[in-house]
């Protein structure tokens, strides 16, 4: 019998390790790589390679991140691990590493610590949909009751931030022992992989979502009408379909009468493609950059929202001085800047460069938004911060 054909089309899932400093996130990442490549094949990455995380720049923000890949029989995973706490904050807020699920690492010798809580809060704010817990260093705890106590504590903490603490998987293991090849602890890594496969649902692909295209440019073509151009962010637009133009002004409806790419007429435009969409009955002055073209009813315009933001440090080219309430920067959504005012949390008087903070923003005109939308904060065209919409207020 011929060997089974190598399947390249496995679903792709993005995950990452989160948790308190020195609780074993990087060791666990190395252990997953080691055990899964040993079991299912692939290229192993060792601790030193993962720990020496390369520096990346995302929207001008410097982030150190390690990316590794591994396979289970049913899926392909891309996994991110960050060396420092600040890297996690930046990564999660900018969406540089979008996670379909996170592995929360808690050392059973310590239990939940301040950054454990902070990473759970960040996960809630930025919309990480699923968390699996790996209790690490269980080889160092002899007392079964102590392990139960730590597990209970972690579950309660997750419930506090609206994750299903009672129901989510908690695996008790030892990343170091698994990495050293001890079979009973290697089995725990396979149990974790099984939890990733079963607990995190297959992510919706961009093409399967409701259609949305952030408008970058507007043209008028004599005898044909108005064309808007941009890159389709999600979904598919077909000729003849109804669309809405959302944001900045009142929402208007139109019909797509043509899709073109590189001067060729097409039947449809798909997620990831740059295309022009011809709109029926729309004047050139009715549409502007910064609005979005969307499937009717799929997205609404809003002016006030709660957000989690990271303020660039001076070294990253950000502000040199703090800002206070009443600060009025521009908020850059998708393709345009909109002025807004900020409201800081109670007890917070000022925000320093390099800080992260939750704040409420009120824009001077409405923008099409969903929770989870990323934005930049700018002053005169220079980026001074990055943020994510955590909750829509109005």
From Swiss-Prot:
Region (G3): 81-84
SUPFAM superfamilies: EF-Tu/eEF-1alpha/eIF2-gamma C-terminal domain, P-loop containing nucleoside triphosphate hydrolases, Translation proteins
Biological source species: Shewanella pealeana (strain ATCC 700345 / ANG-SQ1)
EC number of the protein: 3.6.5.3
Domain tr-type G: 10-204
Gene Ontology MF terms in the entry: GTP binding; GTPase activity; guanosine tetraphosphate binding; translation elongation factor activity
Cellular component terms per the entry's GO annotation: cytosol
Reactions the enzyme catalyzes: GTP + H2O = GDP + phosphate + H(+)
Annotated stretches, region: G2: 60-64
Gene3D superfamilies the record matches: P-loop containing nucleotide triphosphate hydrolases (3.40.50.300), Translation factors (2.40.30.10)
Keyword terms of this UniProt record: Cytoplasm, Elongation factor, GTP-binding, Hydrolase, Magnesium, Metal-binding, Nucleotide-binding, Protein biosynthesis
Superkingdom of source: Bacteria
Name of this protein: Elongation factor Tu
Localization terms from the record: Cytoplasm
């Amino acid at each position: 019998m011929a060997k089974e054909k190598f399947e390249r089309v496995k679903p792709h899932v993005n995950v990452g390790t989160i948790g308190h400093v020195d609780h074993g996130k990087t060791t666990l990442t190395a252990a997953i790589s080691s055990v899964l490549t040993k079991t299912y094949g692939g290229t192993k990455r060792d601790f030193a390679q993962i720990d020496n995380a390369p520096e990346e720049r995302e929207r001008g923000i410097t982030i150190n991140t390690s990316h590794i890949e591994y396979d289970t029989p049913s899926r392909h995973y891309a996994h991110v691990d960050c060396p420092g706490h600040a890297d996690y904050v930046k990564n999660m807020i900018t969406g540089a590493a979008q996670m379909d699920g996170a592995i929360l690492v808690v050392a059973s010798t310590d239990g939940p610590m301040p950054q454990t809580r902070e990473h759970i809060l960040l996960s809630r704010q930025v919309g990480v949909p699923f968390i699996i817990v790996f209790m690490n260093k269980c080889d160092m705890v002899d007392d079964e009751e102590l392990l139960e106590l730590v597990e209970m504590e972690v579950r309660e903490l997750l419930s506090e931030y609206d994750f299903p603490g009672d129901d989510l998987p908690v695996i008790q293991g030892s990343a170091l022992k698994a990495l050293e090849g001890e079979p009973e602890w290697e089995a725990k890594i396979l149990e974790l992989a099984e939890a990733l496969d079963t607990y995190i649902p297959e992510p919706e692909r961009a093409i399967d979502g409701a259609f949305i295209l952030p408008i970058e440019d507007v043209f008028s073509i004599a005898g044909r009408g108005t064309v808007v151009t941009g890159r389709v962010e999600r979904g598919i637009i077909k000729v003849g379909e109804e669309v809405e133009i959302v944001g900045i002004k009142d929402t208007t409806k139109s019909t797509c009468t043509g899709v073109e790419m590189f001067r060729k007429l097409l039947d449809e435009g798909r997620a990831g493609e740059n295309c022009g969409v011809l709109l029926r009955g729309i004047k050139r002055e009715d549409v502007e950059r910064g609005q979005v073209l969307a499937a009717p009813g799929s997205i609404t315009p809003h002016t006030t929202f709660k957000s989690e933001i990271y303020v660039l440090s001076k070294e990253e080219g950000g502000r040199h001085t703090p800002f206070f309430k009443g600060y009025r920067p521009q908020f850059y959504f998708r393709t345009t800047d909109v002025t807004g005012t900020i409201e800081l949390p109670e007890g917070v008087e000022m925000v320093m460069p390099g800080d992260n903070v939750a704040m409420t923003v009120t824009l001077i005109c409405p923008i099409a938004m969903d929770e989870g939308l990323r934005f930049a904060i700018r002053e005169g065209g220079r980026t001074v911060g990055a943020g994510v919409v955590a909750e829509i207020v109005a």
